[in-house]
């Protein structure tokens, strides 16, 4: 009986292998549908529909959050650009002031040097005390 019509194994098959052969041979569409199956299918369809609606709503909320986040980032970008511009302007003003102070300092040193030279030429060095002379030293 090795080659039976149903291609069943000839040696004592176990129930699981017989069931697997049956499942492989008989399409599920050929099985009769019961009322439980149809109500379960309706429930499954309703669950799928609710899940689809829920997923769409979740995706919409996610897009809205992303859009709000992008708007916040753009707002921050504008603020940071403005802050950067004001800092660059402030730095430029500070550099101008620094250059003016350096220039003024150089003028004062030259004036000090000329004054000391004139004092030396006039011979007033003898009237200056050592402490006063140290004031002019840098």
From Swiss-Prot:
UniProt entry tagged with the keyword Coiled coil: yes
SMART domains referenced in this protein's UniProt entry, alphabetically: BRLZ
Ranges for domain bZIP: 45-108
Region spans: Leucine-zipper: 73-87
Compositional bias ranges of the Basic and acidic residues kind: 37-47
Residue span of region Disordered: 30-67
Keywords (A to Z) from UniProt: Coiled coil, DNA-binding, Nucleus, Transcription, Transcription regulation
GO MF term set: DNA binding; DNA-binding transcription factor activity; protein homodimerization activity
Assigned GO CC terms: nucleus
Residue window of motif Nuclear localization signal: 48-55
Subcellular location: Nucleus
Primary location: nucleus
Region of interest (Basic motif), ranges: 47-68
Quaternary structure and partners: Homodimer.
Family per record: Belongs to the bZIP family.
Protein name stated in the entry: Basic leucine zipper 8
Native source organism of the sequence: Arabidopsis thaliana (Mouse-ear cress)
Gene this chain is encoded by: BZIP8
């Amino acid at each position: 009986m090795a080659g039976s019509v149903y291609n069943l194994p000839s040696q004592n098959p176990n129930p699981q292998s017989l069931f697997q052969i049956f499942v492989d041979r008989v399409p599920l569409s050929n099985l009769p549908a019961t009322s439980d199956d149809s109500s379960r299918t309706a429930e499954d369809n309703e669950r799928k529909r609710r899940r689809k609606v829920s997923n769409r709503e979740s995706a919409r909320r996610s897009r809205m959050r992303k859009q709000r986040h992008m708007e916040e980032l753009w707002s921050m970008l504008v603020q940071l650009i403005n802050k950067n511009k004001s800092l660059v302007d402030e730095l430029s003003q500070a550099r101008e002031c620094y250059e003016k102070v350096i220039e003024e300092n150089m003028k004062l040193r030259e004036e000090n040097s000329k004054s000391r030279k004139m004092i030396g030429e006039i011979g007033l060095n003898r009237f200056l005390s050592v402490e006063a002379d140290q004031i002019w030293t840098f």
